[in-house]
Amino acid sequence: MFLAKSIVCLALLAVANAQFNTNYASGRSGMVHLFEWKWDDIAAECENFLGPYGYAGVQVSPVNENAVKDSRPWWERYQPISYKLVTRSGNEEQFASMVRRCNNVGVRIYVDVVFNHMAADGGTYGTGGSTASPSSKSYPGVPFSSLDFNPTCAISNYNDANQVRNCELVGLRDLNQGNSYVQEKIVEFLNHLIDLGVAGFRVDAAKHMWPADLGVIYGSLKNLNTDHGFESGAKAYIVQEVIDMGGEAISKSEYTGLGAITEFRHSDSIGKAFRGKNQLQYLVNWGVSWGFAASDRSLVFVDNHDNQRGHGAGGADVLTYKVPKQYKMASAFMLAHPFGTPRVMSSFSFTDTDQGPPTTDGQNIASPSFNSDNSCSGGWVCEHRWKQIYNMVGFRNAVGSDAIQNWWDNGSNQIAFSRGSKGFVAFNNDNYDLNSSVQTGLPAGTYCDVISGSKSGSSCTGKTVTVGSDGRANISIGSSEDDGVLAIHVNAKL
C-alpha cells in the first residue's frame, strides 16, 4: 500500500514538474510575442525568419472568438464571446495550418488564453458571428448562462483576495472556475488547442482566479500531441499572468507551484537599470535576490503588450521600442543572462494606447512588409527582426547553459561578463566611453561583434574583437555609438 502511494505521489510530481518545461526544440531559445499578427503571416515568419534565426517559440494573440468593438482596439481580443477559433487573425483551419508549419521548422506555439471572464456589456456580436447578452450573462456560443458566473461586483480593493478573484475586472463578466461545467468547457477549449499541436499557454488574468481551480483545470489537460514532434508524456508549458509588485493580498508564490508566472518585477527592474535610475554594476546578482520568482518559474521580458502602453505594472520605467538604444541594451542583457525564460516583444507602432493593429480597411489586419535589412514597415515594429535582438537569440543558443563568469564593472554603468568560455558581452550606459582590457573567457582569435554586425563567411559586417591567448581583449564602446552593447560568441569567430 505504501509503495502504491509512493508511485502515485511520484507520478503526480512528474506531472507537476512537466508544466515548467518549455517544450522547446533542442538548441533553440527565446520566445517572441507576435502581437496581433495573422495566422498565415506567423506561419510564413516561422519558416522564413524565426526558424532560420534560432527562435524557439511564438506567443500568439487570443485565438477564440471575441467581441467586435468600435474602432477595433487591441483589447477586444480579451473580450471572449465563445471558444470558436475565429478572430481577425484567422479561422481554425488557418490556425491549425500555422501550428503545423511552425512545429515543422522547430518553432513552438503558445496561446494567450482568456478564461477568467467573458465580454463586458456592449460586447454583443462576435468575430465568428455569435451573439451574446453580457448584461444578462448569456453567451450561447459556448453556451454559458448566468448560472456559470460569479455575482456582479467590482474590484476596488487589491488587498482583498476574495474581491480580486470573485468580482469583475473592469466590467468583464467573471466566470466561476469552481463550477464543474465551467471547468469542463475551459478544459475542452484548451485540449482542442493541444490536439492542434500547441506547446503551451499564457493564462490571462490568472491572478483573478483561485489557484485551486486552476490546478483542477491544468490537471485535466491532455499530454501534448506527439504527431507534432513532442515527446510522449509531454505536458503544456503554462505561464500565468500574475502581476505581483508586492504589497497586495495576492502573491505570485500562490501560483508558482502550478506553472511559471509573468515576472513583471524583471520588466520594472531592467527598465530602471537601463534608464539610468539604478547603476548597472548592481546587476551582478540579477535573479531571485531581486525579488523574482525562481528561474524556471519566471517568464521574463523587457516590456509586454500591456505595460508598453502604461497598463499593468512598471509605469514610466518600462522600456519600449520608442527608446531604441536602451531597449536594445536591456534586451541584449536579458538574452545574454541565464535567468528565466525570455520573451521578446514584437509590437505594432501606436500613438493611442487603445489603437489596434494596422489594417487594410479599418477592419482587416494588414500583413507586415519587410525591408532588405530584415526590418518591418507598414506600421509594424518587429523588434524581433532588429539585428541587435535576433543576433542575441543566436548568442543565447551558442552559450547554452554555461554559467556567468568573469564579471567586470567600473563601479558604475559599464559592465561585462562571459558565459563560460562560449560567449562574452559588454555594456556601456555611462555618458563617457568604455575603453578597457577585459577578461572574455573565450579562446584566442578574432570575433565578430553580433550587435554592430553579423558574421558573413570569414568576414564581419560590424566591429571585430581580438581575444589574446590569455583570454583578454580590448573592449571599446563609445558613449555616442548607436548601440551601447557589444557581444561575441564562439559561433561568431572569424
Curated annotation (Swiss-Prot):
Extent of the signal sequence: 1-18
Highest taxon of source: Eukaryota
Entry EC number(s): 3.2.1.1
InterPro entries for this protein: A-amylase/branching_C (IPR006048), A-amylase_C (IPR031319), Alpha_amylase (IPR006046), Glyco_hydro_13_cat_dom (IPR006047), Glyco_hydro_b (IPR013780), Glycoside_hydrolase_SF (IPR017853)
Site feature (Transition state stabilizer) residues: D306
Alphabetized GO MF terms: alpha-amylase activity; metal ion binding
Keywords, alphabetical: Calcium, Carbohydrate metabolism, Chloride, Disulfide bond, Glycosidase, Hydrolase, Metal-binding, Signal
Catalytic-site annotation from UniProt: D204, E241
EC top class, as a word: hydrolase
Record SUPFAM superfamilies: (Trans)glycosidases, Glycosyl hydrolase domain
Cofactor note as given: Binds 1 Ca(2+) ion per subunit. Binds 1 Cl(-) ion per subunit.
Family: Belongs to the glycosyl hydrolase 13 family.
Protein name (Swiss-Prot/TrEMBL): Alpha-amylase 2
Lineage: Eukaryota, Metazoa, Ecdysozoa, Arthropoda, Hexapoda
